[in-house]
C-alpha cells in the first residue's frame, strides 16, 4: 500500500530526539510514533545534562551545545536513504543512513 513515513522532533521534549510516524495513505491509519534517534554521542550533546528543548540555537540561548537532535531531513542517493539532522541544539549537522524502513 501507500505509506508515508514522517520524521520530526518536538520542541519541549527532554531530550529533543528524532521521531518517526507511519501513516497508511490508503486508510489514513496512523501508527504510534517511535523514537528513532536520540543524542548519545559527545558531539550530539550525549553527555550533557537534560534540559527542556526550546526553539532556536542553543548557542544564543545557553552559550553552547545542549543534549538535542532536531530538524530531520531525508534524502535518497544511489538507492540509499539518509537523514540529515541538527545536533547539540543546532551546533552541528549529523548524517545517518536509514536501513530497513518500510520492511516487514
Where are these regions (language model features)?
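Carbohydrate-active catalytic/glycan-binding domains of CAZyme proteins
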Residues: 1-104
Amino acid at each position: 500500500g501507500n505509506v508515508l513515513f514522517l520524521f520530526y522532533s518536538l520542541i519541549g521534549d527532554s531530550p529533543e530526539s528524532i521521531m518517526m510516524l507511519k501513516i497508511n495513505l490508503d486508510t489514513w491509519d496512523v501508527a504510534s510514533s517511535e523514537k528513532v534517534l536520540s543524542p548519545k554521542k559527545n558531539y550530539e550533546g550525549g553527555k550533557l545534562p537534560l534540559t527542556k528543548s526550546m526553539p532556536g540555537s542553543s548557542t544564543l540561548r545557553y552559550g553552547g551545545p545542549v543534549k538535542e537532535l532536531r530538524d530531520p531531513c531525508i534524502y535518497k542517493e544511489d538507492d540509499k536513504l539518509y537523514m540529515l539532522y541538527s545536533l547539540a541544539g543546532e551546533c552541528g549537522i549529523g548524517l545517518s543512513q536509514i536501513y530497513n524502513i518500510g520492511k516487514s
